[in-house]
């Protein structure tokens, strides 16, 4: 998910910097939330004291929002049975058999620390809530009405403490929803988008009825997929969205087959997981129907086209474009993951670049770090190792930079760069922007300024030779000076 060197440059360059703009870009996301998601650290943590320390650490690092799973099959009674318990009322959160204890503790911890909670209401559910319970496959064909009743129970129980819900997690992956495709004679056509649309249409009004002021997000799609050769291949996210909205590749309405009698899914926003794996944040996905962070423009264009075609309905306004919530984003590291990881220093660098890119997009409202602490590494790199800490709790370089991301954008002009930084938690802070000549140990302050209400500042600087930049700040007056990672800015060849 650096560089060395520094003396003051010449008077001319200094004058150019002194006259540079320091205000955030007009088209940037002014209210970008910082989130984190790691159920193992809080929701599933058997040590209450450790979970409390973790939540306190998150708050101190500037986290605004914590995503937690309301996992249907874990909360519901007798999830492996083919029949629901006799007399069980799934819409009633007080129905005997529901076990809310772990989620209750996690929500209370997060809210008590002053952070918001986003609940991902998701399967797999109980076997008895599927269309074919005899298969004992909890991921296969969940019954929309049953999911709607569970969603209502969740919103009834947590509505006073939760303002945002996500409907299902990564429905384009067979790990979460099946079948992904219907395959006949070697041809596979999307199935999961149509099942997901029915799940959303059942759960969204159920949540609204129990928690009228809530925001309900849909999507939460994984960023890449496969060319399908079986019914449970992973589906590419843009393929999924076209199926969800019943449009063809040119975003024209399609009302054939599973789209007959089409009625659109409705939502307040779109959740998305633009993990880059080993690809830099600004590197585009090689497949046109996949979308990483660099491809959000393509994703947004498709969402707009589907919405115009009547395939999705924004409940915040008929013509209002959907906001994006990046509810998972991370880079796995090597060590320990030698299959999909990058070096820990590269993780720190790319997470900061990703934070800048998310801020730069005015439609992005949330960026959530996934995860806090590495999972244990299984065969072939199984598990997630994108934490800010290793599994043994040792910090990675990204933990140091997380509360003070800093990036230098060389794409803004031929002989200029935009410096971007953020102090987390947000609020107005005094920062000092410094520079040094590569090879020098001396940093010189070139500008003192205040951040905006989200802790963000930008500064345009002239680029005439290689220079290192950083910013410094104090958490409180008299506290120790904290410094961002340095960024080297150099002229671009050919410009």
Question: What do these predicted regions represent?
Answer:
Residues 9-20:
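Bacterial N-terminal signal peptides
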Residues 455-459:
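Short strand-edge motifs at loop-to-beta-strand transitions and within beta-strands
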């Amino acid at each position: 998910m650096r560089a060395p060197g520094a003396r003051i440059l010449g008077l001319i360059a200094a004058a150019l910097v002194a006259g540079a703009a320091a205000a955030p870009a007009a088209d940037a996301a002014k209210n970008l939330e910082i989130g984190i998601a790691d159920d193992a650290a809080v929701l599933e943590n058997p040590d209450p004291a450790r979970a409390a320390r973790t939540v306190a650490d998150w708050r101190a690092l500037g986290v605004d929002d914590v995503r937690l799973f309301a996992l249907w099959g874990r909360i519901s009674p007798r999830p492996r049975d083919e029949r629901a318990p006799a007399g069980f009322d799934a819409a009633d959160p007080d129905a005997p058999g529901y076990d809310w204890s772990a989620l209750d503790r996690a929500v209370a911890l997060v809210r008590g620390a002053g952070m918001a909670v986003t609940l991902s209401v998701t399967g797999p559910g109980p076997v008895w809530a599927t269309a074919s319970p005899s298969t004992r496959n909890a991921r296969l064909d969940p019954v929309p009405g049953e999911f709607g009743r569970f969603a209502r129970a969740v919103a009834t129980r947590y509505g006073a403490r939760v303002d945002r819900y996500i409907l299902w997690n990564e429905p384009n992956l067979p790990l979460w929803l099946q079948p992904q495709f219907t395959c006949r004679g070697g041809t596979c056509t999307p199935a999961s988008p149509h099942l997901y649309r029915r799940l959303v249409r059942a759960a969204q009004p159920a949540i609204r009825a129990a928690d009228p002021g809530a925001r309900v997000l849909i999507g939460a799609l994984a960023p890449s997929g496969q060319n399908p050769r079986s019914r449970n291949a992973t589906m590419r996210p843009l393929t999924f969205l076209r199926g969800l909205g019943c449009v063809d590749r040119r975003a024209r309405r399609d009302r054939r087959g599973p789209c007959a009698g089409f009625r659109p899914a409705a939502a307040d926003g779109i959740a998305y997981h633009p993990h880059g794996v080993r690809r830099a944040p600004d590197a585009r996905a090689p497949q046109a129907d996949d979308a990483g962070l660099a491809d959000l423009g393509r994703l947004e264009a498709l969402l707009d086209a589907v919405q115009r075609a009547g395939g999705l309905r924004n409940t915040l306004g008929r013509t209002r474009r959907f906001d994006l919530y990046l509810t998972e984003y991370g880079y796995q590291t090597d060590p320990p993951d030698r299959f999909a990881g990058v070096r820990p220093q590269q993780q720190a660098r790319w997470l900061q670049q990703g934070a800048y890119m998310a801020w730069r997009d005015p439609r992005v409202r949330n960026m959530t770090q996934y995860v806090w602490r590495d999972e244990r590494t299984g065969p072939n790199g199984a598990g997630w190792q994108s934490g800010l800490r290793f599994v043994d709790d040792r910090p990675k370089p990204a933990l140091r930079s997380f509360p003070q991301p800093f990036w230098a954008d060389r794409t803004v002009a031929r002989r200029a760069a935009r410096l971007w930084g953020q102090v987390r938690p947000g609020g107005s802070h005094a920062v000092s922007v410094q520079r040094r000549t590569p090879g020098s140990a001396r940093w010189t302050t070139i500008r003192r300024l205040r951040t905006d209400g989200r802790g963000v500042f930008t500064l345009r600087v002239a680029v005439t030779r290689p220079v290192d930049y950083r910013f410094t700040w104090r958490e409180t007056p008299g506290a120790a000076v904290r410094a961002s990672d340095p960024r080297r800015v150099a002229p671009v060849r050919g410009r």
